[in-house]
Regions:
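Short, surface-exposed beta-edge/turn micro-motifs
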Residues: 31, 96-99, 106-109
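Surface-exposed, low-hydrophobicity interaction/linker segments
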Residues: 40-101
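Structural alpha-beta junctions
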Residues: 1-2, 27-33, 127-136
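N-terminal interaction modules that seed assembly of large macromolecular complexes
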Residues: 3-59
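Acidic, proline/glycine-rich low-complexity IDRs
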Residues: 103-148
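Short, surface-exposed beta-strand/loop "edge" segments at domain boundaries and coil↔beta transitions
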Residues: 13-19, 31-33, 82-83, 110, ...
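Generic structural motif
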Residues: 10-14, 39, 77-80, 104-106, ...
């Protein structure tokens, strides 16, 4: 694993009802299934962990219904296909998951990946569109807890 483990950025107050989040997820991998924990302002998903894995289309439906992700943690499907308990950065990097997306208020993002190429791809996508874009390295980790 390389030194770059993630990226953080702000979406400059885009009021897009999760459209930018969907663009980010599709950029990571449009065919990946996602494990979702979320706090949203939509009652059906308030303080919930959605069972199983969602396809990008199913996730888009959830995000369209929720309108605004107050806090959402989305993890790409792990190799074993079984949900694993992820509470810390170390749990994530010891797991089979490849990517973890943390989003607050549909505006602030932290994306962690075991593949540096994924982080660099997201950096190219957000450059010039977002503010406070910062690469996260093993030495400069912003967060140790990955809990929702």
């Amino acid at each position: 694993m390389k030194d770059i483990i993630g990226i953080s950025f702000d979406t400059n107050d885009l009021d897009d009802d999760n459209a930018f989040l969907m663009m980010v997820l599709k950029e990571i991998d449009a065919d990946l299934e996602w494990k979702v924990d979320c706090f949203t302002d939509y009652e059906d998903y308030l303080n919930s962990e959605i069972e199983g894995y969602l396809s990008i289309k199913e996730l888009e439906k959830v995000l369209n219904e929720s309108k605004k992700a107050i806090f959402i943690r989305i993890m790409g499907k792990n190799k074993a296909g079984k949900p694993q308990s992820i509470e810390t950065k170390n749990d994530f990097f010891a797991s089979d998951y490849e990517v973890c997306v943390l989003c607050c208020d549909s505006a602030y993002y932290e994306i962690y990946s075991k593949q540096e190429e994924t982080v660099l791809k997201i950096k190219s996508m957000v450059a010039g569109r977002c503010s406070h874009v910062e690469m996260i390295t093993k030495q400069t980790v912003c967060r140790t807890e990955f809990m929702v």
